[in-house]
Amino acid sequence: MFSIALPLALATISPAVPAASVTSGAAIAVCFSREEDCAAFAVRAINNAQREVLVSAYGLTTGSGTVEALVRAKGRGVDVRLIADKTTPCPATNGIEPLAAAGVQIWIDGQARIAHAKTMVIDEAVTLMGSYNWIRGAAANSENLNLVSSVAVAAAYAAHWRERLAVTV
């Protein structure tokens, strides 16, 4: 079983990230698709959620494990909420329908030309962010997914999520 605490405690910060730009006490783990299984990386983080997952998604499809993990989290009593881009619903692999069926609250960000954020804030302490789309085809792309364990970073992303929520439909 994956535990966020140990890998984050052991995580090292890439030399490409200036130390001054990292919140004190933050631990960072990174994943690069094609070379690594970023869907499994995200699923492990979601599986550790106990209270809340705030999701911002440009693309969201079934089949990668992410939607399925969010449905399971909701089933465990985790408060899962989603803000999606207006173009997210798509035929056949639509991730919105199973989430809605599970009782996940969903809003559409129709104000922005494109709601291109791809983030999750988990339990006000862990933030997933990067270019990685929550879609089945992302594994074939060159994308990145970063997991930051920091209450301060999570608070900033949660505040932005709530700002976007204020303008959704």
Which positions does each model-derived feature cover?
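Short, small/polar-rich loop/turn modules that mediate ligand/substrate recognition or access, typified
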Residues: F2-A40, T88-P91, A139-S142, H160-V169
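Extracellular/periplasmic catalytic domains that process cell-envelope and extracellular macromolecules
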Residues: S24, N47-N48, L99-A100, A112-A115, ...
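Short, flexible loop segments at the rims of nucleotide/cofactor-binding pockets, characterized by
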Residues: I28-R34, A57-L60, V104-W107
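Conserved beta-strand termini and adjacent loop/short-helix elements that scaffold enzyme active sites
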Residues: C31-S33, I83-D85, D109-Q111
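Alpha-helical scaffolding within the catalytic cores
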Residues: D37-A40, V67-E68, I114
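Primarily the HKD phosphodiesterase
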Residues: A42-V104
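Solvent-exposed loop/turn segments at secondary-structure junctions
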Residues: G59-G63, K86-C90, A112-A115, V126-T127, ...
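Signature of lipid phosphatidyltransferase scaffolds
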Residues: I122, V126-V169
